[in-house]
Amino acid sequence: MTQPATTPRPVLVVDFGAQYAQLIARRVREASIYSEVVPHSATVKEIKAKNPAALILSGGPSSVYADGAPQLKPELLELGVPVFGICYGFQAMNHALGGNVAQTGDREYGRTEITHTGGVLHDGLEENHKVWMSHGDAVDKAPEGFTVTASSAGAPVAAMECVAKQMAGVQYHPEVMHSPHGQEVLVRFLTEVAGLEQTWTSANIAQQLIDDVRAQIGPEGRAICGLSGGVDSAVAAALVQRAIGDRLTCVFVDHGLLRAGEREQVEKDFVASTGAKLITAHEADAFLSKLAGVTDPEAKRKAIGAEFIRSFERAVAQALEESPEDSTVDFLVQGTLYPDVVESGGGDGTANIKSHHNVGGLPDDVEFELVEPLRLLFKDEVRAVGRELGLPEEIVARQPFPGPGLGIRIIGEVTEERLEILRQADLIARTELTNAGLDGDIWQCPVVLLADVRSVGVQGDGRTYGHPIVLRPVSSEDAMTADWTRVPYDVLEKISTRITNEVNDVNRVVVDITSKPPGTIEWE
């Protein structure tokens, strides 16, 4: 899908190799200002063509003096747009403007106290407060015309600004939650130094995306969307349905690996709230047949993926055959998000793909043009747009769920009996976490069945050998990193008691308290 014509002028985050570049863009958007990420290798011409409202120079792992270190193009500072430097970007900006970056040998990593002397960025904040530092080199002299507004033990110039030039920067990372006042500082740059308006709201986003989809598909075009039951595909489908009405057909493949109530939720709640046409393919038997005897995690993923391709192909072929008016479907809707675009090297331009490229396995003589209405959004924005469109909270607030479903939450062979055990345990855990009001604190809570493990237990007057269930509650902002959620003991006790009493063949419940890294969120 091409860059929407209605997208506002972006605040461009120039990525110098930072692990937080996407997070910076998210923080800008949280301030109701549109932002995108561009690589530092982008030419001045390419950046200028995006008509940026401001530039933010991200952090990075390098020293400005290191061989091969990413370079700031000085011409970017001459575009006449506001510029904000963070960490490495702060040093690179200083270096380019004639300040001095010293290799002091005094490194600062983690929580660090800074002392500020006012200025626009820090005015009104505590004179001494904690920020998150991650630097080796340090700026010891600001460029001419800049006012030094903060310092730390290892950074003589920890913040500087020149309001007249609409330029500022900080040595620390304002985008991370370990800098408690970081978002305030970022917003002050955007609104008070750069003078930008805060107009990027869920209502505006939704209407812009609807208009863009309507323009792409046209007055007579037809589209197909594969629903997974997740929030991304649901919101993408709702946007397209709002744009083209009954010219959209949704296909939902029930592979038998769903959690309790998920198929019904799609068939009832989604259809009721959108009015979309829906075809459900009941393919549980086909998937279980392919998974018989398979225990290797990667082999399971591949088997599920390959069978999904075939199932989706059959469902689409059936839809085209049963609805002659849909035989000229030219568009395929997908719930691609902005992090996917950035991580894949993203680029603009219409994506015309062979049908087997992304969902795979469609007839070779069928070509679709991709419609990706969410390709500029982060997950939290997708949820906000979903609420704006009137989707039920059960769909919008749904925790992330892997495509292979419960198939990769059973450690061992996947069977119908084991799926039923896991569904019951998962439903109990989800219900009790919701009842405890913890849905807002937990990014997701995989429930895992150790099907190949037999744990000894005592129930009643006899010894039992049952399977352990693992609870994996994690908190995260983007799933790139995660911490285990500190669920109150009384809630854990209730979950454990219910599972061991109500679910057959389970006699032990354990909690996974591993952060990511080193552990991934899913077990397989």
UniProtKB/Swiss-Prot annotation:
One of its GO terms (cellular component) is cytosol. InterPro entries: Class_I_gatase-like (IPR029062), GATASE (IPR017926), GMP_synth_C (IPR001674), GMP_synth_GATase (IPR004739), GMP_synthase (IPR022955), GMPS_ATP_PPase_dom (IPR025777), NAD/GMP_synthase (IPR022310), Rossmann-like_a/b/a_fold (IPR014729). Homodimer. Its EC number is 6.3.5.2. This is GMP synthase [glutamine-hydrolyzing]. Pathway: Purine metabolism; GMP biosynthesis; GMP from XMP (L-Gln route): step 1/1. The gene is guaA. It catalyses: XMP + L-glutamine + ATP + H2O = GMP + L-glutamate + AMP + diphosphate + 2 H(+). Catalyzes the synthesis of GMP from XMP. Keywords: ATP-binding, Glutamine amidotransferase, GMP biosynthesis, Ligase, Nucleotide-binding, Purine biosynthesis. It is an enzyme of class 6 (ligase). Gene3D superfamilies: 3.30.300.10, 3.40.50.880, HUPs. PROSITE patterns: GATASE_TYPE_1, GMPS_ATP_PPASE. Residues 10-199 form the Glutamine amidotransferase type-1 domain. Pfam families: GATase, GMP_synt_C, NAD_synthase. Residues 200-398 form the GMPS ATP-PPase domain. The active site is at C87 (nucleophile), H173, E175. One of its GO terms (molecular function) is ATP binding. ATP binds at S228, G229, G230, V231, D232, S233, A234.
